Amino acid sequence: YPLIEDTLRHMDKEKLIEFGMNLGYNGCTQGAHIVRKIKRTENINVPWLFFLNIDSSYADLHSRYQAIFDQGKELGIYVYCLYTDGDPEKLLPLIEHNPDCAMILLCNSAAVTEDFAKAAESLNNMLIGVAYDDNTDTACLVLRDHRLLYSIYRMYTDTESDEILSGSYARFAEEMHCPFVAVLADPGCSASVRENVYKAVVGARVAQKYRTIPIDLFYDIERIGNIISPPSSIIGFKPDGSIYNIGSDGNPLEHNIFNESLRDCLLYTSDAA
């Protein structure tokens, strides 16, 4: 109850409802039905969510990337985790053009400006993930002033897990009024540290220890994928279009989304598995 009350106080209700419907119904119900059917009839492991690292330097992002979303929805994918090293504001028209999808836009805190927040106000299908660094509190304040849906995330290494395990990272997220607090292991992170972090994440979540919901962006996505259609597939696309398997330390594969259809890329990935 404290989490719900806090979220409704600081974030727009319509954004919470629309993002939640896209995630829960389009992504995990309607989309999941399509994912399971394709697995059953074509033996293709379709992910329920995938990561897309976008090169925002292109003048016409719509013509370059919209086909990926169109193909994804045909396969039952309605949840996307987007990232760019450039200006995230340039990705907003793509998000607007796919109102039936739940879009998670990962941003560096320095990229969260007043102009960005104002441009994002009209979008109800997006959650903004702010990177955890020295400027995160300022970025969260900007987003909160515009009543946008946001949370924070951090990538951790073997030497950077203490804040997560001690709970100080989650307590910071509480102070920032985040409904979610996410972690993601660096590809070089050891299996033992990853497991300890995930145990801490699940333990805190089950105990409702904080006024925020801890999430592990790898293990929880994998877990949901295994519920929808096992074995779970966790993949992403780099700015050049090459596909990589997040479950294999981000190793690139031979196939490219700009040279082949998404269905073919996933078919080859399923065959490789």
Where are these regions (language model features)?
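Short, acidic/polar
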Residues: 64-69, 165-169
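Leucine-rich repeat
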Residues: 65, 90-92
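Long, low-complexity regulatory tails in eukaryotic proteins
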Residues: 237-262
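Core AdoMet radical
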Residues: 49-60, 72-89, 98-137, 143, ...
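N-terminal [4Fe-4S]-dependent radical SAM core
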Residues: 1-53, 74
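Conserved C-terminal portion of the radical SAM core fold
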Residues: 54, 79, 135-229, 234-240
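Conserved small/polar residues in nucleotide/adenosyl-binding loops
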Residues: 268-273
